Each structure stands twice: as structure tokens, then as C-alpha cells.
Swiss-Prot record:
Main localization category: cytoplasm
Protein residues bound to S-adenosyl-L-methionine: 32-34, 51, 78, 99, 106
Name the UniProt record assigns to this protein: Ribosomal RNA small subunit methyltransferase H
Origin species: Sulfurihydrogenibium azorense (strain DSM 15241 / OCM 825 / Az-Fu1)
PANTHER family: 12S RRNA N4-METHYLCYTIDINE METHYLTRANSFERASE (PTHR11265:SF0), S-ADENOSYL-METHYLTRANSFERASE MRAW (PTHR11265)
Signal peptide interval: none
Gene3D superfamilies: Putative methyltransferase TM0872, insert domain, Vaccinia Virus protein VP39
EC code: 2.1.1.199
Length: 293
């Protein structure tokens, strides 16, 4: 049984309730939360769950065991969605879901996604990939750190943070999340250190995006998804920061103008107050939905 509900789960179910028989691709299956609810609601659907995280796939397999024969799990990046569809020979694809957030259980694993605990600086979603957060913070030049933190984190104190990271690592390597979070914390002016959002949030986001090449993968995957989904099929995206949301918005707009898509969400859907109370991490989520013409 699902131990917690995935972000915007009610809204996902609303948009998927009328899907016809076929395959639904959960391109970021995580622990299988959305997939579980979709399979339960839609007895004629089969799900292909994709994730690059081995542990996520283990959790999803256990969670979806009641639906044996109606789901397949694939270890892959969602940017390879076209190859997955071809290899598994799935047709028609009536829906595709992208949830770009970090799974709650990934935050619990000691992989450096969270600055709430002392953990090694890793941040890889695919633990077999080479680039780690440790390498980024200890070996990237100051100018590159500034660019990443400024662009991917939209952090106004990026220059100061990059400078302080480089100063600190001259004395010793930055090995843990706590060390990095403390450097960022001290880079903020004292009067801004105690706001609702921790000063390290944007920097951690930026480094995670760099390590996992997230934005380029989102762009590539969306382009492919639009050509994979069948006519009348839907694409649902859940973004957690403005850079992701902007990519989705611009891609949907481009394909609407090309008469490929009908955008079903004129403005992004955000979580209701009760969901935010239950799951504060959902606060920044934005959902956009489009239908293939």
C-alpha cells in the first residue's frame, strides 16, 4: 500500500481518469506513488515505469506488486524515452507523466541531496554515473561555480558563495553536505540567514541540476514525448522550480503553434492548502498538461 501520496496526485488522477486502453509511461516512476494510483483507477492501462535510480526501482517494484502483469520497470534516463518505447514495442502510448522532483526516499538516502543531515557530497540519481557534487564543489573553477549557482539556482548571492567555496577548499576539501550548507549560510547577509527557505536550498538545487544534467534531459525528453504519445493522449509535467517550468511552458507553446498540442492548463496547477500542510515539499510544484492533436 502507498505509504504517502505523490505530489498533486488528485490532479494527476483527474487528468488520467478518461484515458483509453493502452500504455502509460511514468517517466520518473520514483517509488511508484503516481503509478500505483493510476493502475488502481484505470484497469485497462499498463504502465512503463522509468527511473535511473536502482533503489527507486526496487521500491516501485514492491509497491506495484499487486498489479503483476500490468507494469514494467526500466532503468534508464527519461531522455531515452524513444528508445524505451521502441525496445519494448509499446503501442499506443496514451499518456506520459514527468515528475521532476527529487523523491522523498532519495532525500532520506545518504546521497547528499539534503542539507538537513551530515552526508557525503554525492547527489547522483544514477549512482553509476561519474560526476558527483564532491567533484563540482572541490574542482570546478570559481567562474564555473558562479555560473551554475547563478543560472541553475537563480541565487542572487552566487558570486559570494562561489568565492567562499573556493576559499574554504584551499584549506581542506569540502566533503559533506553540512560543510557546504554552512559555507552558503555564512555567505548570506546576517539579516537574511533565518528566512523560511534555508539559504543553502538554491545552491544545492543548482549543484544537483549540474550533477544530473537535468535541464537538458528535460528538454530532450519533452520533445520526444510529444512525438511518442498517440492522438488524444496526454502529457503531464510536474516542475519544482522556474527553470523546469519555463522549459515545459515554452515547449508546449511551440508545439501548440505547430498544431501538435492543445494545452489543457492555461495556467499551471499548484497544490491546494491541505496538500501543502500534509507535504510541505509540494509547495513549489507546478503542473502543466497538454493533449496531442
Amino acid at each position: 500500500m502507498v505509504e504517502h501520496y505523490s505530489v498533486l496526485h488528485r490532479e494527476v488522477l483527474e487528468f488520467t481518469k478518461d484515458l483509453k486502453e493502452g500504455y502509460f509511461i511514468d517517466a520518473t516512476v520514483g517509488g511508484g506513488g503516481h503509478s500505483y494510483l493510476i493502475l488502481k483507477q484505470n484497469p485497462k492501462l499498463k504502465i512503463i515505469g522509468v527511473d535511473k535510480d536502482d533503489y527507486a526501482l526496487e521500491v516501485a517494484k514492491e509497491r506495484l506488486k499487486d498489479f503483476e502483469g500490468r507494469f514494467s520497470l526500466v532503468k534508464s534516463s527519461f531522455k531515452d524515452i524513444d528508445k524505451i518505447v521502441k525496445d519494448l514495442d509499446v503501442n499506443p502510448v496514451v499518456g506520459i507523466l514527468f515528475d521532476f522532483g527529487v523523491s522523498h526516499f532519495q532525500l532520506k538516502l545518504p546521497r547528499g541531496f539534503s542539507f538537513q543531515r551530515e552526508e557525503p557530497l554525492d547527489m547522483r540519481m544514477d549512482t553509476s554515473s561519474e560526476l558527483t557534487a564532491y567533484y563540482v564543489v572541490n574542482y570546478y573553477p570559481e567562474s564555473r561555480l558562479f555560473n551554475i549557482i547563478s543560472k541553475y539556482g537563480e541565487e542572487k548571492f552566487a558570486k559570494r558563495i562561489a568565492k567562499n567555496i573556493v576559499e574554504y577548499r584551499k584549506k581542506k576539501k569540502i566533503e559533506t553536505t553540512k560543510e557546504l550548507a554552512d559555507i552558503v549560510y555564512r555567505s548570506y547577509p546576517p539579516n537574511l540567514r533565518h528566512s523560511r527557505i534555508h539559504p543553502a536550498t538554491k545552491t544545492f538545487q543548482a549543484i544537483r541540476i549540474e550533477v544530473n544534467n537535468e535541464l537538458l534531459e528535460i528538454e530532450e525528453a519533452l520533445e520526444k514525448a510529444i512525438h511518442i504519445v498517440s492522438k488524444e493522449g496526454i502529457i503531464i509535467t510536474i516542475s519544482f522550480h522556474s527553470l523546469e517550468d519555463r522549459i515545459v511552458k515554452n515547449t508546449f507553446k511551440k508545439y501548440k503553434e505547430l498544431k501538435f498540442l492543445d494545452i489543457l492548463t492555461k495556467k499551471p496547477i499548484t497544490p491546494k492548502e491541505d496538500e501543502i500542510r500534509e507535504n510541505p515539499a509540494s509547495r513549489s510544484a507546478k503542473m502543466r498538461v497538454a493533449r496531442r492533436l
